[in-house]
Amino acid sequence: MDFNAVNAAAEGYREDMVKFLRDLVKIPGESAEEGNKIARAKAEMEKLGFDKIDIDPQGNLLGYMGSGEKLIAFDGHMDTVGIGEMSNWKFDPYDGYETETEIGGRGTSDQEGGIVSA
Protein backbone atom coordinates (compact mmCIF):
# COMPACT_ATOMS: atom_id res chain seq x y z
CA MET A 1 0.00 0.00 0.00
CA ASP A 2 1.37 3.40 -0.95
CA PHE A 3 1.65 5.42 2.28
CA ASN A 4 1.94 8.71 0.41
CA ALA A 5 -1.29 8.04 -1.47
CA VAL A 6 -3.09 7.13 1.77
CA ASN A 7 -1.73 10.24 3.48
CA ALA A 8 -2.76 12.45 0.56
CA ALA A 9 -6.28 10.98 0.60
CA ALA A 10 -6.54 11.53 4.37
CA GLU A 11 -5.56 15.19 3.95
CA GLY A 12 -8.75 15.66 1.97
CA TYR A 13 -10.73 14.94 5.14
CA ARG A 14 -8.75 17.27 7.43
CA GLU A 15 -11.22 20.17 7.53
CA ASP A 16 -14.23 17.93 8.23
CA MET A 17 -12.33 15.94 10.87
CA VAL A 18 -11.16 19.08 12.66
CA LYS A 19 -14.72 20.43 12.73
CA PHE A 20 -16.08 17.11 14.03
CA LEU A 21 -13.46 16.93 16.81
CA ARG A 22 -13.97 20.58 17.78
CA ASP A 23 -17.74 19.93 17.92
CA LEU A 24 -17.25 16.92 20.22
CA VAL A 25 -14.98 18.92 22.55
CA LYS A 26 -17.70 21.58 22.96
CA ILE A 27 -20.28 19.02 24.11
CA PRO A 28 -19.99 18.11 27.80
CA GLY A 29 -20.24 14.35 28.26
CA GLU A 30 -19.20 12.94 31.58
CA SER A 31 -19.74 9.21 32.12
CA ALA A 32 -23.38 8.15 31.61
CA GLU A 33 -24.19 11.67 30.32
CA GLU A 34 -22.70 11.49 26.83
CA GLY A 35 -25.99 11.31 24.91
CA ASN A 36 -25.42 14.61 23.11
CA LYS A 37 -21.97 13.46 21.99
CA ILE A 38 -23.53 10.24 20.70
CA ALA A 39 -26.12 12.26 18.77
CA ARG A 40 -23.37 14.37 17.15
CA ALA A 41 -21.38 11.27 16.20
CA LYS A 42 -24.51 9.63 14.79
CA ALA A 43 -25.11 12.70 12.61
CA GLU A 44 -21.53 12.44 11.31
CA MET A 45 -22.02 8.75 10.50
CA GLU A 46 -25.19 9.61 8.58
CA LYS A 47 -23.30 12.31 6.66
CA LEU A 48 -20.59 9.77 5.78
CA GLY A 49 -23.16 7.32 4.43
CA PHE A 50 -22.98 4.48 6.93
CA ASP A 51 -25.24 1.62 5.81
CA LYS A 52 -26.71 1.04 9.26
CA ILE A 53 -26.53 2.99 12.52
CA ASP A 54 -27.94 1.78 15.83
CA ILE A 55 -27.89 2.95 19.43
CA ASP A 56 -28.17 -0.06 21.72
CA PRO A 57 -30.01 -0.12 25.09
CA GLN A 58 -26.79 0.83 26.93
CA GLY A 59 -26.36 3.92 24.72
CA ASN A 60 -23.55 2.54 22.56
CA LEU A 61 -23.41 3.84 19.00
CA LEU A 62 -22.95 1.09 16.42
CA GLY A 63 -22.23 1.86 12.79
CA TYR A 64 -21.89 -0.48 9.83
CA MET A 65 -20.43 0.04 6.35
CA GLY A 66 -20.10 -2.50 3.59
CA SER A 67 -20.21 -6.27 3.81
CA GLY A 68 -17.98 -9.26 3.27
CA GLU A 69 -16.12 -12.09 4.93
CA LYS A 70 -13.78 -9.87 6.93
CA LEU A 71 -14.89 -7.43 9.59
CA ILE A 72 -12.92 -4.44 10.79
CA ALA A 73 -14.15 -3.20 14.15
CA PHE A 74 -13.31 -0.02 16.03
CA ASP A 75 -14.17 0.38 19.69
CA GLY A 76 -13.89 3.66 21.54
CA HIS A 77 -15.52 5.82 24.18
CA MET A 78 -16.69 9.42 24.17
CA ASP A 79 -17.33 10.02 27.84
CA THR A 80 -14.93 12.24 29.77
CA VAL A 81 -14.07 12.90 33.38
CA GLY A 82 -15.17 16.15 34.96
CA ILE A 83 -13.14 19.31 34.48
CA GLY A 84 -12.62 19.94 38.19
CA GLU A 85 -11.80 23.55 39.03
CA MET A 86 -12.09 25.77 35.96
CA SER A 87 -9.42 28.05 37.43
CA ASN A 88 -6.88 25.22 37.03
CA TRP A 89 -7.25 25.32 33.25
CA LYS A 90 -5.20 27.60 30.98
CA PHE A 91 -8.06 27.49 28.45
CA ASP A 92 -11.75 26.64 28.48
CA PRO A 93 -11.73 22.82 28.21
CA TYR A 94 -15.07 22.85 26.38
CA ASP A 95 -13.92 25.47 23.89
CA GLY A 96 -10.46 24.02 23.47
CA TYR A 97 -7.84 25.39 21.15
CA GLU A 98 -6.38 24.71 17.75
CA THR A 99 -2.90 25.39 16.42
CA GLU A 100 -1.28 24.39 13.15
CA THR A 101 -0.24 21.05 14.67
CA GLU A 102 -2.66 20.21 17.48
CA ILE A 103 -6.17 20.44 18.82
CA GLY A 104 -6.65 20.56 22.58
CA GLY A 105 -9.70 20.34 24.76
CA ARG A 106 -11.65 17.96 26.96
CA GLY A 107 -11.54 14.48 25.42
CA THR A 108 -9.19 15.14 22.49
CA SER A 109 -6.53 12.67 23.63
CA ASP A 110 -8.86 10.29 25.50
CA GLN A 111 -10.40 9.19 23.13
CA GLU A 112 -12.31 11.52 20.85
CA GLY A 113 -9.34 12.24 18.60
CA GLY A 114 -9.02 8.52 17.92
CA ILE A 115 -12.71 8.16 17.22
CA VAL A 116 -12.62 11.02 14.72
CA SER A 117 -9.51 9.54 13.07
CA ALA A 118 -11.19 6.16 12.63
What is each stretch, according to the model?
Residues 2-108:
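Acidic/His- and Gly-rich active-site-bordering loop/insert found
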Residues 107-118:
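Active-site alpha-helical elements of protease catalytic centers
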